[in-house]
Amino acid sequence: MNNNTPPYKITSKILKLSTQISEELTKLQFTGTQKINPMLRKKNRIKTLAGTLEIEGNFLGEEKITAILDGKRVLGTVKELAEVQGAIKAYEKLDNYRFDELDDLLLAHKILMDEILTTAGSFRSVNVKVGEHIAPKASMVNELMINLFSWLKNSDEHMLLKSCIFHYEFEFIHPFSDGNGRIGRLWQSVILNSFNPIFSLLPTESIVRDYQEEYYKAIEDSTELGENTPFIEFMLEMIFKSIQTTLKSDQKSNYKSDQKVLALMKENSKITIYELMEKLSMSESGIKKVIKKLKDENIINRVGSLKSGHWEIKE
């Protein structure tokens, strides 16, 4: 590979998906990123961690990852637990990585694999074969990665395309002795996050996990074809699905919040905002947004003052 753009074609599918992603991002941003509540943010991060690990055969799953994040002890092999801890630490620094700096990618690999590999953070020194794919010789890896990052830094491609192209080229080079899949997916997220921080909230890796066979087939198809096009199309589809999933989850979460607030008001018409916050584990601003929405929809009304009044349910 040289500094030229890796080979790919702009297909009608790529154009359509790019447009759809832009439209869905606008929907997500229209309400503000704060609309995605902290619980959903945490849930999506856990989905991301579980997804990227399960693709590599670590099936500790969302429940145990949640427990680990909460500081609880869980059962698992030393390697499984080390992989989870490494993934948690690597993704915690998502906002700090510079997408076009090779040293930052090496740092990410060091963090991810530190308890697993003695060579964590260093390129492989041996030749490897992945399935039917014979990766470039170990002696070529450093130059190939320098060139890939030079292209990443200097090319004019849209960041959506850059993220997909980088992901495939990285997997093709296979620069590390282990952890390539996890780093490839992480770095696509880093590139997307640098384009728009809202991408850090999306569980794209968990969607890829659900389409794991298609993921590997897209890599194989691109390798056979000698260009990135099949993989770009596949990953754009995964990004689109992850945005749609988040929109639906957030809408469902907000609907549930509305119903919970309403149920508590029906149970106790004199319930205060503070009591609602306590019972539902929501912030004051979150409760006030729900109340405003219910008022705007003419479902509730406040009779009297906040101190001595009560809620009137109109439905």
Positions of predicted regions on the chain:
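FIC/Doc superfamily catalytic core
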Residues: 1-315
